[in-house]
Amino acid sequence: MALPMVLYDHYGSLQQGELTGRIVILTHGLCMNHLSWSNSRYGGIGERLLAQRDNNTMLYLNYNTGRRISANGRSFANVLEDLVQRNPRITSIDLIGHSMGGLVSRSALFYGKQNLYQWVHMVENLVCIGSPHHGAALERFGFILQDKLGAFPFISLIGQLINIRSNGIL
């Protein structure tokens, strides 16, 4: 079952109503969701940012981490363009992404620029927290292991099993 890409407000409701001024969009990492930003186990960064906001609107992106980063980035770019079109009084955008969320945000900027989207010029900050911009070690290990096991016909089945992994980390 595919999860739709959705923006939530800080209170966990679907984003509705008019937005003005600066908006801050937090994008979660692999195998997480929009609620992770407020979880005290992860430092409660969403709560702390909310307490320090000066008339900023905090939004939380929820997306399917099983999709490829490029597909999520393209969808996120479209979501942002729709958001700005529906809310012409937005003045600036900050994107904060954790791990895979930083990669998805960066990908959204790429596709936003490619499509000449209006929102790209509103982005003032892109903050990536622990994002593997040079690739994830786990994924590199998976490719190496798959390659080595594939060389032995009698254990190539194990190599095929290793190849079954989320598109989000390919």
What is each stretch, according to the model?
Residues 42-47, 76-83, 105-114:
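Short, well-ordered amphipathic alpha-helices
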Residues 67-87:
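Alpha/beta-hydrolase active-site loop
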Residues 1-49, 53-61, 138-141, 147:
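Flexible, membrane-associating and regulatory peripheral segments of lipid-active enzymes
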Residues 87-98:
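Alpha/beta-hydrolase fold nucleophile elbow
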Residues 21-23, 92-94, 125:
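Structural motif
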Residues 30-32, 65-66, 102, 110, ...:
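Short, solvent-exposed loop/turn segments at secondary-structure junctions
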Residues 96-97, 101-105, 130:
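Gly/Ala-rich beta-loop-alpha elbow adjacent to hydrolase catalytic centers
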Residues 110-170:
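Helical cap/lid subdomain of alpha/beta-hydrolase-fold lipid enzymes
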